Amino acid sequence: RTFVLQGGEDPGFSDELVCQTVRAIWNRFPDCAVTLSLGEKSPEIYRLYHEAGAERYLLRHETADPVHYRKLHPREMSWAHRMDCLHALRKTGFQVGCGFMVGSPFQTAECLAADLKFLEEFQPEMCGIGPFIPHHGTPFREYPAGTPELTVYLLSLIRLILPGVLLPATTALGTIAPDGREQGILAGGNVIMPNLSRASVRKKYELYDNK
């Protein structure tokens, strides 16, 4: 079992509070792992998180194609820095997770091939992929969603490439198809992540419509 603490890159949510939360979970549930997914941080902050007791960190690489990455992100973000963060996490001692959205804007078959090659070379302990689902408040609101069929197919390929990887059947897959999570498990997924957040606060972390 593992507790996954996931959030945006919010400067109002201090690193000390993250560490306090990790320690509190460890004290109450010493038999469980703690996974963080809080975006790009400095190597020093990653080390603080690890020393507090976090064992795993999920940071999706988003795409293995630098040109595609530039099309998806603001100018101040770079593919090279994302790679630096992933390698810093591994150097710190984390079990590292990466991944990508299926059907994201401007994605091509060549992008997906590069993603699979990157996973084979990086050998992550976790891999999170799910269909792109547009959000009405973003620049990509008019783009079509990714398909469950392609997502499930890629899950099966990743299972063959990385036989021992932790591979979630994601919430997004369950959102886009009524039996999406079941399809994901049958295709090779081996992790289910129920949302333990109170219903009253879930709208504060609305990554896509109908999350």
Task: Report each predicted region and the residues it spans.
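A general structural detector for well-ordered alpha-helical segments in enzyme core domains, enriched
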Residues: 17-25, 45, 81-86, 111-119, ...
